[in-house]
Amino acid sequence: MSTIMKHTVGFIASIVLTLLAVYVTLYTSLTFHAKLTIIFGFAFVQAGLQLLMFMHLTEGKDGRLQTFKVIFALVITLCFVVGTYWVMQGGHSSHL
């Protein structure tokens, strides 16, 4: 796929994901938690799309290595966030 075609597809997909998030927020009667979950899902999909289509994550001779580096960074970040939440909840519940 050519660069212009990749950028066009990525741009259109980003707009569609943004409009879907707006639609879910304004025109559905879902609960706040459900809306937030859906919007975060769209945001993560859009972030991945940005990495693949615009940042050229998988291109080049070390594209696979770059992909593994990003996945590793995401796993470490997730461990920090979940671990911090777990420790804070444990500390809070032991003081109540």
UniProtKB/Swiss-Prot annotation:
Pfam families: COX4_pro. One of its GO terms (molecular function) is cytochrome bo3 ubiquinol oxidase activity. Keywords: Cell membrane, Membrane, Oxidoreductase, Transmembrane, Transmembrane helix. The chain crosses the membrane at residues 8-28, 36-56, 68-88. It is found in: Cell membrane. NCBIfam families: QoxD. This is Probable quinol oxidase subunit 4. It comes from Staphylococcus aureus (strain NCTC 8325 / PS 47).
